[in-house]
């Protein structure tokens, strides 16, 4: 029997870490060599002080040569996806070109590309791009939606009604300013060398706001041999009066024709930036009243949180498909499992008041949840002190847990979500 093929998998945390362990334990399956650190948890985040994409990629490329890697991958937005592309380039392995990753992840450059290839799906952007810790210049039209040119997890992304609100948003303390700079600088350094026309990533993008009544959706897909294909669309449901996600549901309620339009936009954008292989997810709004589809961004990586939803409802494994692409194999050849649910959801528990953050479930509550929901997936995300305060400052809320559940239909899903929330001692919203 031939030896299992080995791959490098970078910054595999949470959903990706679970998938890496599951796939790596499969008999006869590939074996994974992990690398990276948790940039939001101590002590791993101390490594951010000295992190350099090129140095990290060179070290991992040397490791890959020594271990005989057949592929490399990462779905980590902030650091991993670009690092995997750099390593694949150095080792001559399958993967997206680093310039394509840069073009998609630099939100200012990506917006300009989208305006050229799919203007009907692009939000209007103001030419002014202030940086963190800068005073907002004159001439900005309010209200506007503000987000970092290079960001992740909706950090520092929100609508601001006036100049005073924007100034408060950009007013960082010394530690916050340092952290924001360090999060972006490794990316900006590569961008200056490989995509200089994009401009500085240490900036904020100002876009036209979209009414809160307009729902958000996520198209997941993959590219192989230059062909762009869809996995499906996941619907976002938000907390009332906010853009904060309450849950994600699959399958989507969007008409098939609208889903096809989203795929067409993704195809044009990915072709324009030269993204030829890998997974992607396209975040977009769709306003049924005006029939307008507006792209938020296109991420050149798997939306890892949703992989479990596809496994439950369709019996397909997006993480396994990503591994196949990293090995230059056809993901469609992978076997499908029997679906176990008609609908599935990723429930996101948030607090909007620092004084109202519930404690994480203790051992008894976790055991009760496991007994009642053997199919359930529980991910507590507790924070305290400065990390908790930073969540409220940068995101406007604190995400303290996620639960995944499946059901035969949406009515049963709501019932199961209420029961699970009660067992965990967490607030239930639907």
PLM features per residue range, with description:
Residues 133-135, 166-168, 292, 354-360, ...:
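Short, conserved charged micro-motifs
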Residues 84-86, 291-301:
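A short beta-strand motif that forms the metal-chelation/ATP-contact edge
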Residues 170-238, 261-264, 285-294:
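Phosphate-binding site of ATP-dependent enzymes
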Residues 1-100, 116, 131-132, 328-329, ...:
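ATP-binding N-terminal substructure of ATP-dependent carboxylate-amine bond-forming enzymes
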Residues 158, 207-208, 399-407:
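Short, well-ordered beta-strand elements within core beta-sheets of diverse protein domains
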Residues 261-282, 300-358:
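Active-site "cap" helix and flanking loop/linker of ATP-utilizing ligase/carboxylase catalytic domains
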Residues 350-384:
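Glycine-rich active-site loop/lid that clamps phosphate-bearing ligands
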Residues 85, 89-159, 163, 174-194:
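A conserved helix-loop-beta module that forms one wall/lid of the active-site cleft
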């Amino acid at each position: 029997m031939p030896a299992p093929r080995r791959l490098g998998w970078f910054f595999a945390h949470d959903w990706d870490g679970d998938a890496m362990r599951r796939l790596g334990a499969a008999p006869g399956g590939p074996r994974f060599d992990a690398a990276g650190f948790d940039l939001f948890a101590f002590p791993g985040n101390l490594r951010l002080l000295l992190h350099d994409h090129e140095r990290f990629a060179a070290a991992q490329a040397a490791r890959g040569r020594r271990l005989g890697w057949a592929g490399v991958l990462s779905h980590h937005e902030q650091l991993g996806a670009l690092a995997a592309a750099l390593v694949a380039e150095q080792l001559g392995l399958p993967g997206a070109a680093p310039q394509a990753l840069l073009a998609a992840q630099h939100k200012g450059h990506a917006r300009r590309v989208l305006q050229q290839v799919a203007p009907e799906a692009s939000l209007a952007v103001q030419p002014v791009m202030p940086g963190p810790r800068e005073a907002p210049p004159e001439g900005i039209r309010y209200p506007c939606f503000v987000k970092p040119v290079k960001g992740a997890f909706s950090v520092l992304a929100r609508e601001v009604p006036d100049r005073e609100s924007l100034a408060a948003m950009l007013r960082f303390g010394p530690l916050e300013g340092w952290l924001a700079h360090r999060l972006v600088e490794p990316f900006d350094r590569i961008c200056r060398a490989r995509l200089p026309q994009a401009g500085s990533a240490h900036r904020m993008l100002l876009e036209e706001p979209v009414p809160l009544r307009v729902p958000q959706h996520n198209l997941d897909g993959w590219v192989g041999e230059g062909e762009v294909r869809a996995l499906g669309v996941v619907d976002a449901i938000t907390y009332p009066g906010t853009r904060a996600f309450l849950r994600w549901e699959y399958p989507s309620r969007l008409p098939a024709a609208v889903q096809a339009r989203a795929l067409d936009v993704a195809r044009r954008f990915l072709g324009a930036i030269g993204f030829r292989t890998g997974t992607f997810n396209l975040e977009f709004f769709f306003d049924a009243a005006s029939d307008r589809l507006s792209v938020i961004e296109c991420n050149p990586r798997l939306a890892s949180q949703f992989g479990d939803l596809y496994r439950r409802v369709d019996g397909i494994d997006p993480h396994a498909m990503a591994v196949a692409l990293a090995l230059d194999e056809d993901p469609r050849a992978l076997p499908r499992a029997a679906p176990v649910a008609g609908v599935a959801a990723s429930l996101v528990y948030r607090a909007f008041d620092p004084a109202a953050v519930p404690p994480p479930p203790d051992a008894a509550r976790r055991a009760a949840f496991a007994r009642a929901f053997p199919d359930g997936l529980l991910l507590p995300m507790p924070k305290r002190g400065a990390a908790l305060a930073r969540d409220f400052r940068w995101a406007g809320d604190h995400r303290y847990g996620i639960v995944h559940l499946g059901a035969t239909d949406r009515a049963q899903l709501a019932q199961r979500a209420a029961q699970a929330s009660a067992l965990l001692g967490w607030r239930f919203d639907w």
